[in-house]
Amino acid sequence: MRHSIAPERRASIAAGILCLLIACAVALVVLTRERILLSVTLDLPGAVPGASDPSPRFEFARVDLGMAVILLLVFSAIMRTAYRIPGSRWIERGLVTPITIFLIAGLNGITDAGSLIAIYSLTSAMVLFDMAQLRASRLSATSPWALGTMVGIVPWGIIALHQVGGGLAGHPAPIFVQVITMTVLVLTAGASFAFWRERAGRTTAQWHIALSTTTTCLFAVEAAALIVTA
């Protein structure tokens, strides 16, 4: 007797295959183009508060944008196709979403390790609140989803602050980086809204899977295009 695969599983497998195909395309770009490295810096203590000399800053890490995108896609593909692993959907989202926004912050010129860690942590907290919503009986103004939404806005506020500050200082983010930022922001908000509708019983999980996969894949394509044009 043949067992049919649930629509959610079929959508997840299709998403995994798409991620793998795009990972191969991005790998080809990374191998043939110059790398884009995102700096991670740390301000060392030692300067006197109020002194004119700033605290010494050093670069202790560089993140290869292309390789990071490839790893995100491969990990997403594994989690999407390994639907028999309990909670694979949330394991994937819990890692991919924070790292994606971390990379976007780096593209917007945020290099301070403290800011980057805060962005990653707050985005992870948003995903954890969404996971908690799975056990909640209802959606309300104080439900885990609502609290997660409020927390999840903060990283985008930090990124927006740096974009505005860079523009006022005469060093605005490149137009293409602004497009990437706005695209991922809109799609991330859409995926969160789809999850809310899913928990409210107004739609199915396929919509959330489709939007979250579109976010990852479109970010990867835009990052590859940025590498090509760099």
What are these regions (language model features)?
Residues R2-S88, E92, T97-A230:
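Polytopic alpha-helical membrane-helix bundles and their juxtamembrane interface segments
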